[in-house]
A protein has these predicted regions:
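The canonical Cys-X-X-Cys-His
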Residues: 47-58, 114, 136
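C-terminal capping alpha-helices of c-type cytochrome domains
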Residues: 111-114, 120, 124-150
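Acidic helix-start/capping segments at beta-turn-to-alpha-helix junctions
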Residues: 61-75
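Soluble non-cytosolic domains of exported or imported proteins
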Residues: 37, 41, 45, 96, ...
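Sequence/structural segment immediately N-terminal to covalent heme-attachment motifs in c-type
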Residues: 39-52, 74
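Extracytoplasmic electron-transfer domains, predominantly the class I c-type cytochrome c fold
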Residues: 72-122
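Post-cleavage N-terminal segment of exported redox proteins
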Residues: 1-34, 142-153
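Sequence context of c-type cytochrome heme-c attachment sites
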Residues: 23-38, 87-92, 117, 121
Length: 153
């Protein structure tokens, strides 16, 4: 048992020498959702606080991002989040995709699927109140409808 613990400790120490890349991709404000949709500041603040760490190129890495293997899991989570929806590159999405992503965002916020519980453990200030959830879902749906109307044939 003692040998197993020593081996595990050595492995834990060794993996600390393999950090994640915390470089955020460049941000072009002209492609950012909050800018192109002229999001009102109170709603923009909520989106930045509760969504942007995983769904933008403006991730603020927490202290535990220095500890492996937790950091590897965190990096994978952020990469997956950006792949699903990246507010920093929202303007590059086709209008149909924009509308679909906004519909999904509204549903996920309403159904309490976002922000993830695992994210809230390290970011309790990102937790949304019921009124914030309603406000965000309504905002996403409003922008979704505007996007669909503007781009209807």
């Amino acid at each position: 048992m003692k040998k197993i613990l020593i081996v595990l400790l050595v492995i834990f120490i060794i993996i600390q020498f393999f950090p994640i890349d915390k470089t955020n991709p460049a941000v072009n404000e002209g492609m950012d959702f909050l800018k192109i949709k002229n999001t009102p500041e109170p709603i923009a603040k909520t989106i930045r606080n509760s969504c942007y760490d995983c769904h933008s190129n403006e991730t603020k890495y927490p202290f535990y991002s220095h500890i492996q293997p937790v950091a590897w899991l965190l990096k994978n989570h952020i990469d997956e989040g950006r792949k699903e929806l990246n507010f920093s590159t929202f303007a590059t999405y086709e209008p149909k995709r924009q509308a679909h992503k906004l519909q999904e965002a509204a549903e996920y916020v309403e159904q309490k699927k976002m922000p993830l519980e695992s994210f809230l453990l390290g970011h309790p200030d990102a937790k949304l109140s019921e009124s914030q959830r309603k406000e965000l879902a309504n905002y996403f749906r409003t922008i979704q409808k505007e996007t669909e109307t503007t781009n209807a044939l």
